[in-house]
Amino acid sequence: MNLIMLILALWAPVAGSMPELSLTLFDEPPPLVETEPLPPLPDVSEYRVEYSEARCVLRSGGRLEALWTLRGNLSVPTPTPRVYYQTLEGYADRVPTPVEDISESLVAKRYWLRDYRVPQRTKLVLFYFSPCHQCQTYYVECEPRCLVPWVPLWSSLEDIERLLFEDRRLMAYYALTIKSAQYTLMMVAVIQVFWGLYVKGWLHRHFPWMFSDQW
């Protein structure tokens, strides 16, 4: 009991000397800061794309060649388009910027992409474009098809694999037959050259009776 009385005696002067805290945070509301109004958005209703077309093929070795045509009221300069390709694993954006054809027309533009190697299992090529910098972005897609001639002497096995991926089995079997015949004729020609240069001369020297008139 004496200990409690001593603590209360020491606490009384300390509590009496503590300052009173104000619980009011803001006596008056803060003043409003006047800001300048935002500039109006530019009117882009006049810019539009009325027609878009995409054509893309795969040359020998999986080299992509694509052409995109745009017609409409386009701004000058037009925003740089982007090209992506889609495979079975996903999308890729490593495609370089397409080249724009220089023409005098302001209502039509053409973009080219040549000799860019893509995977054999490419499903789609997507071309993203916009008629102006503030306009909505559009895209047009195309499915690349392997371009194989009727006599596919220079086609590779990758091209045949691409034909099978596109479910063009008849063309793939035809190309495989031509390539098999080509390799067979090449092997026959190599054997004939080897026979004439080496084997026949060796037989003449060691077995001359094989080439006598009696035979």
Curated annotation (Swiss-Prot):
The Ig-like H-type domain, residue ranges: 47-146
Keyword terms: Disulfide bond, Early protein, Glycoprotein, Host endoplasmic reticulum, Host membrane, Host-virus interaction, Immunoglobulin domain, Late protein, Membrane, Signal, Transmembrane, Transmembrane helix, Viral immunoevasion
Cytoplasmic side stretches: 204-215
Bilayer topology: Single-pass type I membrane protein
Lumenal side: 18-182
Highest taxon of the lineage: Viruses
Coarse class of the protein's main subcellular location: host cell
Keyword Cell cycle in record: no
Subcellular location: Host endoplasmic reticulum membrane
Glycan-modified residues: N73
Keyword Iron listed: no
Summary of the function given for this chain in its UniProt record: Participates in the inhibition of the host immune response. Redirects newly synthesized major histocompatibility complex (MHC) class I heavy chains via the SEC61 translocon to the cytosol where they undergo proteasome-dependent destruction. In consequence, infected cells are masked for immune recognition by cytotoxic T-lymphocytes.
Subunit structure: Interacts with host TRAM1.
UniProt-recorded name of the protein: Unique short US11 glycoprotein
Native source organism of the sequence: Human cytomegalovirus (strain Towne) (HHV-5)
